[in-house]
Amino acid sequence: MSSVSAAGATPPASPGCIAGIGMDLLRIERIERALARHGDRFAQKILGPKELAKFQARRRRDPARGVRFLATRFAAKEAFSKAIGLGMRMPMSWRRVQTLNAPGGRPVLVIGAELADWFDARFGAAHVSITDESDMAAAYVIVERKPAPDGRP
């Protein structure tokens, strides 16, 4: 698991309390069908700019790998929306949170400016874990409670 603040910097380790947990599990075939039905518009609706560039590069090299990438990012966004308690309603939207990779490869959540103020006012760090295997993709997100001004969780 990894954590990133809304600004994209990895926060220091803290004894934060859990504010929310989200999980999503989906069949990769569901994403394949959506791409077949809606084409690139589907990926453009779901992915942020950096995710979209990575998706397109992976799909060019290996179409199946591109679909798995899109499925894990879809699952991460669903899991994040559940962890923060909003679902897919404002200020949360598909493109306002991206799952990118830290230099070592671990997945990190990067929250866009449109959502960052809302998130930072309520929460501390967000942690994400994603996986795909065979015909399934899954993501778990844990959101920490915002620490008290005196530093206590």
Swiss-Prot record:
<keyword id="KW-0444">Lipid biosynthesis</keyword>
<dbReference type="GO" id="GO:0008897">
    <property type="term" value="F:holo-[acyl-carrier-protein] synthase activity"/>
</dbReference>
<keyword id="KW-0276">Fatty acid metabolism</keyword>
<feature type="binding site">
    <location>
        <position position="24"/>
    </location>
    <ligand>
        <name>Mg(2+)</name>
    </ligand>
</feature>
<keyword id="KW-0479">Metal-binding</keyword>
<keyword id="KW-0443">Lipid metabolism</keyword>
<dbReference type="InterPro" id="IPR004568">
    <property type="entry name" value="Ppantetheine-prot_Trfase_dom"/>
</dbReference>
<feature type="binding site">
    <location>
        <position position="78"/>
    </location>
    <ligand>
        <name>Mg(2+)</name>
    </ligand>
</feature>
<dbReference type="GO" id="GO:0000287">
    <property type="term" value="F:magnesium ion binding"/>
</dbReference>
<dbReference type="GO" id="GO:0005737">
    <property type="term" value="C:cytoplasm"/>
</dbReference>
<keyword id="KW-0460">Magnesium</keyword>
<dbReference type="GO" id="GO:0006633">
    <property type="term" value="P:fatty acid biosynthetic process"/>
</dbReference>
<protein>
    <recommendedName>
        <fullName>Holo-[acyl-carrier-protein] synthase</fullName>
        <ecNumber>2.7.8.7</ecNumber>
    </recommendedName>
</protein>
<dbReference type="InterPro" id="IPR037143">
    <property type="entry name" value="4-PPantetheinyl_Trfase_dom_sf"/>
</dbReference>
<comment type="similarity">
    <text>Belongs to the P-Pant transferase superfamily. AcpS family.</text>
</comment>
<dbReference type="InterPro" id="IPR002582">
    <property type="entry name" value="ACPS"/>
</dbReference>
<keyword id="KW-0275">Fatty acid biosynthesis</keyword>
<dbReference type="Pfam" id="PF01648">
    <property type="entry name" value="ACPS"/>
</dbReference>
<comment type="function">
    <text>Transfers the 4'-phosphopantetheine moiety from coenzyme A to a Ser of acyl-carrier-protein.</text>
</comment>
<keyword id="KW-0963">Cytoplasm</keyword>
<keyword id="KW-0808">Transferase</keyword>
<dbReference type="InterPro" id="IPR008278">
    <property type="entry name" value="4-PPantetheinyl_Trfase_dom"/>
</dbReference>
